[in-house]
């Protein structure tokens, strides 16, 4: 029950419906099932929306409508009297929070429009107003709010800032590390500390490897709920626990025995094959068969009788026996086909080999680990102290402060627990332990609502732990009194072709060992509607593999990259889809594992005329080719004797020297000089005094003269002109800006070059002058392995999308191509010199001196790197965790598709059959096999081979070179939009340079004189708008767009034609109509025509007004309905006047204008402005009018002393009315 006050000051009582009982929920489920609608809520969705009074874990499979469930549940809570500000709603990203808030807002608007009860309308309106202050956001954002409010309780100032710049963090870390390192090198235990540093860095002078170890340990500890306690209690956990053979975990012994038994079974399967050859021609057992039978029998016996024959104490003896029993190779060959029978067992033996020796030396490294523990603890405390002094923190610091506040202050914790009706979290599978602790502190123990899908947990690199979700899942299933598990299995996104192949693949791949969850019936995808089950034979999934048997070297030298042939396969399929089936490009998406090494995709697509839009990629502005060329040009101007920069400039398109030219120049060495730089050789070559002047032919001599003349002019200009002007001079002199316009990614390249000039200009304006300082600044950024922000260009809307699998999460696309399926999973972390684990702590490779063990007397030491037992345990867990993450990545990628999924890879057709024999295997691929296969492609081929008798819902097809000829691939059926010859006289760089020179001069003149001379006493927002709109966007995109526009048309006017109605007249007429339109009546065509007669405009203007669009605004948009619902609060065409201070002249002036519409409520104002401008994207007008609406808001706030909480643009210049919140 809720009390409000009416206009007379009388209390209004709102009675809310109670929460549904389990019986009422069942009744609702039955009613929904009987409804005659194609799209119904599932029983599980209804249960997730309406169940209350207990902890709830919703396991929502891909495309099951989890966001719909969350929004509906929130709305149901509000309708039952729970205010939106009493819900804690955590999202994984800021973008997700914004989208969720918008969905709730739209739902509230819709509910207000449907509600006839006045009291309920008032209540829902209040919820709408409270929405912007509600706790809907990331855990980081909430933690900041807690620390800002209660930081004083733990001695933290509320006036802190977030250190988001990695470069700033690195500088502070380096300062702390260096100081601490010197202290430890001079302490009492310095010899042990030196041994520690040498164990990782080789010597005490190069500390980079040791520094990386410390930083990694620190970062890892920050993801735990209490870093200090973890470092003190868990960091050396495994080192203290696993010191004897008896300490080895039973699970690891079981895995070894399982590998032995699997090897015996696989070997038996191979020996039973028809072509194996068990008998000789004489009819007796062959020697090979006898040997293999012995291996099978002994392995089986040792597994069965392990405890009595060996036990843990005899594990080292077992390892020696098995090593001596099996052959050193991995394969058994039958009929020229190799079966890797012993591969997995060899890997296991390697893990346990020399255990006694390792354990003997492992004791020696414990003192090193204690020193490391002390150093990391000291580093953590010192680094935090520096950040406290600077009042600048990282996100993890803020989260730990929030945890500390809630743990140490019972009253604060209880106030939050009492305030929040429910603690809701989205993407729960991606939480880490720090976030889980914070959620636990906010909850009262029985009011948590968690939504996620462990099969989509793909953020382990951010220390996300899917086992948090998994443990809750198991606990709630075993003990229902702790919480309820609800499974959302129905998929409403994909056709059956996608669902079937996903189920087929993961039912053979995913279980608790690899994937962290058994992909059984409760996790399989089910079509949510009948329409999804309609079969389409041409949408069957395909694994398309380029046959590399005759690979001509088209693949990049880097095996991680995708080959030209693979991309050509994709281009061929896209052309077929577009030409034959009319599939628009924007319906097609390419998914890749990483943002790097994808240039070949853009280049190949450009050749075939396929438009492509990328997701931006990682920050690599300084690594883009055109920027690197310009930076080397500037380095050469600064110091021509920098050979690396000089060679790069000579080889660049500006001068186009080839390898032969450079070789001839290199031979002009002066034999009397020991060190001779390339610049000196060029000068000698020009005057004919080199060691081999006969090699410098006339053409080369001419190129050298041009180069030296140009370089001389640049170096002279660099001393006199600005860096900004120098860059534009380079563009003009060598046509480089124009050259990149003819290359792939022309817009991006030109924007990058333009941004370089602007950044140089900003650098000099900040007080740093000179080319040398600019180069040093850039080099410093590169040295810290950082980069400058990438320049964004407007991506084409009608284009194929290219993005990473991580970026695609939560999205859906009709056609999905999963590229580079032959790329090996990154196993870099499991080969490092140390591995961290939350339970076990740290495991290291120890550099042991085994001189005594070998009895060596001549050498000072014999160093051997040993994998300690903790390291081996952590390594095995990390390997399985990595494979599990990759498996979940494949799941995410496949379930993005709505209609069809393609797998693209490369393999040798002749070698692709080398998989284990399909006999005697269960539903899953053997664990040993899943562990040894390290690509998506290997998994799919293994499934296709071993389970070939099943319908796996995907086909494997090898593509030959003959399938990828120009004729076979085909061409897009699109007209040529632009004749390149039309641009032959268009020198963009000159035009831009002249424009920028003019703008610079005008800007300087304005800054010096115009403020004082031309300041008017009265201004309008439209006049001020021009001062806020940049003449040229910083990234240069607008210039590029304008340069491609056609020249002005000077066609003579046709006087017989009627004059065109001015856009400004249409805008004025619209404003008049919106002012006089009676909102108390239903808005339809007749109402609009009646109102139109009363405005002061000629008939041509009235006829030009699109009344259907205006009607659509009021009838089809929530804002239009808001106009009608709250017409008593509405003010239209309201004039205003306020005093403003000119920022330059410091003179006051009057700002006058007219506000189209605003709603005045008791505690806030909503502002609305109509625009009839033509536009391509709404964001254009949002940027254009943002400052104008801020002026309107300022005027309203000054007048009413109330905040303007919402500002809307009503865009009438498109095909339909669009509402944009500013």
Swiss-Prot record:
Its EC number is 3.1.-.-, 5.6.2.4. One of its GO terms (cellular component) is cytosol. Signal peptide: none annotated. GO terms for molecular function: 3'-5' DNA helicase activity; 3'-5' exonuclease activity; ATP binding; ATP hydrolysis activity; double-stranded DNA binding. GO terms for biological process: double-strand break repair via homologous recombination. It comes from the Bacteria. Keywords: ATP-binding, DNA damage, DNA repair, DNA-binding, Exonuclease, Helicase, Hydrolase, Isomerase, Nuclease, Nucleotide-binding. The keyword Transport does not apply. Residues 512-798 form the UvrD-like helicase C-terminal domain. InterPro entries: AddA, DNA_helicase_UvrD-like_C, DNA_helicase_UvrD/REP, P-loop_NTPase, PDDEXK-like_dom_sf, PDDEXK_AddAB-type, Restrct_endonuc-II-like, UvrD-like_ATP-bd. ATP binds at residues 48-55. Residues 27-483 form the UvrD-like helicase ATP-binding domain. It catalyses: Couples ATP hydrolysis with the unwinding of duplex DNA by translocating in the 3'-5' direction; ATP + H2O = ADP + phosphate + H(+). SUPFAM superfamilies: P-loop containing nucleoside triphosphate hydrolases, Restriction endonuclease-like. Its cofactor is Mg(2+). Belongs to the helicase family. AddA subfamily. The heterodimer acts as both an ATP-dependent DNA helicase and an ATP-dependent, dual-direction single-stranded exonuclease. Recognizes the chi site generating a DNA molecule suitable for the initiation of homologous recombination. The AddA nuclease domain is required for chi fragment generation; this subunit has the helicase and 3' -> 5' nuclease activities. Heterodimer of AddA and AddB/RexB. This is ATP-dependent helicase/nuclease subunit A. It comes from Streptococcus pyogenes serotype M1. The lineage of its organism: Bacteria, Bacillati, Bacillota, Bacilli, Lactobacillales.
